[in-house]
Amino acid sequence: MTDLSRARYAELFGPTTGDRIRLADTDLLIEITEDRGGGPGLAGDEAVFGGGKVLRESMGQGRATRAEGAPDTVITGVVVVDHWGIIKADVGIRGGRIVALGKAGNPDTMSGVHPDLVVGPSTEIIAGNGKILTAGGIDCHVHFICPQIMDEALGGGITTMIGGGTGPAEGSKATTVTPGSWHTARMLEALDGWPMNIALLGKGNTVSSESMWEQLRGGVSGFKLHEDWGSTPAAIDACLTVADAAGVQVALHSDTLNEAGFVEDTLAAIAGRAIHAYHTEGAGGGHAPDIITVAAHANVLPSSTNPTRPHTVNTLDEHLDMLMVCHHLSPKIPEDLAFAESRIRPSTIAAEDLLHDLGAISMIGSDSQAMGRIGEVVLRTWQTAHVMKRRRGFLAGDNGADNQRVQRYVAKYTICPAVAHGLEDEIGSVEVGKLADLVLWDPAFFGVRPHAVIKGGMIAWAAMGDANASIPTPQPVLPRPMFGAAPKAAAATSVHFVAPHALEDGLADRLDLSRRLVPVANVRSRGKADMPRNDAQPRIEVDPDTFTVRIDGDVWEEQPAAELPMAQRYFLF
């Protein structure tokens, strides 16, 4: 047999163990640590589709029927990037779920074929050779202001949304809340036909426990406490008391003006209970100037929103106007202007960069249309990783490649929000048994534009050329909805996450929904230690006069980035 050079092997079958791949135009490199397809040692047996290729009848394609276990789809020779590792494998999908990561093919003619990856006549092939596969992104901070956010999110690699809203109402523009069972029912119906998993948050700003139980029975997955509705210590305690009894998560936007108390009072009201702290840095809201200190606490699950990711020379200028609009403020009212200015602090925004790189802030969401951009969750995560690589070099354990850093950052918008909100049994990683919510990337466009977004095993969104062309690739190649985005298919491949009490109360019978209703897992005992690769608890101090931030005693100096990757090389605007 003719020997293949590593370069030639990569051209034919994709990279293999020991090969390194640059992510878009960043300084980040990944190195493949394992090739479950056999690599060069089994050259010629790779599962490759096409004319004159392996996956043909009685060659790489066997006789197994679907009833005998053949997968519905195999993604061939793809590099899987997940919090648990960076490997190459064939990925099998059956019934909308991941069934195996290994070697696909025909065991009658090939060695080492995984028993759940036996290619048969019923098997579709997606060529992943030379591409990267990640879990579908989870945006943990979504304002449901307009339905068009779905297209933008899918086009950015997001397949699950956690948040709330009812449309362009003032409450929804400012707060991620779907208040009350009537609004919740209508939103569950409205979102039924989109290729997107949904977890709605109800209003937690009340001391009425029955009001919250009513919302849980109505189909919310948890609660949101927002200062615009009054995040008082009494409301925080009441909401967490109900959440503890129901097993659901609470997301917190605390009191920027410190009217009802300071950060210490909020922490006292939380009383060591699990809570998801939104935009922990504070530009998006929260006790000024030291809300960022909550990221040091074991019971707090901290996240960022993407407008401050990463800290750049333009970050401060755009934030003031955004904030005035989002929170229904007037520049003509001095108190409103002071409120807005108190939230924008370059020192804490700069410290946010470092806390992400340390794994102390565990998640990144968008804050869509409410100071954040829903299509840029993935992109800004990797821009932050790039900026930190330039400033801090390799992380411990990395040498020549950035696997540790990449695994930390991919977890911020996949497994960490899934664990925080009790969704990890269904989504959040590329693992056997989970929904096949997957994003396929060309390495040159990693984090920028997906090659394809697979929702529950079906391609829902993809880069596609002119539909009147003779082949799929002529320009303009644009991200477009595919058959998996059609309403009935989308409902069959997506889920609504709801509180267990909603199912016990018969919500599925009360609403005419096409998709599955899935109960969230009990999250009340979860804390920072449960955030994969993002469980650090450094000491964080903020000077109340100068806003200087010390992390484990050291001042983190502001060095806003003047240039970023994944920007104007890819976008006109």
From Swiss-Prot:
Localisation: Cytoplasm
Modified residues (N6-carboxylysine): 224
Binding site for Ni(2+) 1: 141, 143, 224, 367
UniProt cross-references to HAMAP family, sorted A to Z: Urease_alpha (MF_01953)
Subunit structure: Heterotrimer of UreA (gamma), UreB (beta) and UreC (alpha) subunits. Three heterotrimers associate to form the active enzyme.
Protein's name according to its UniProt entry: Urease subunit alpha
Taxonomic lineage of the native organism: Bacteria, Bacillati, Actinomycetota, Actinomycetes, Mycobacteriales
Catalyses which reaction(s): urea + 2 H2O + H(+) = hydrogencarbonate + 2 NH4(+)
Binding site for substrate: 226
Annotated ranges, domain Urease: 136-573
Pathway, per record: Nitrogen metabolism; urea degradation; CO(2) and NH(3) from urea (urease route): step 1/1
Cofactor field: Ni cation
Gene Ontology BP, a term: urea catabolic process
Residues reported to bind Ni(2+) 2: 224, 253, 279
UniProt GO molecular function: nickel cation binding; urease activity
Key words, A-Z: Cytoplasm, Hydrolase, Metal-binding, Nickel
Catalytic residue list: 327
Record's GO cellular component terms: cytoplasm
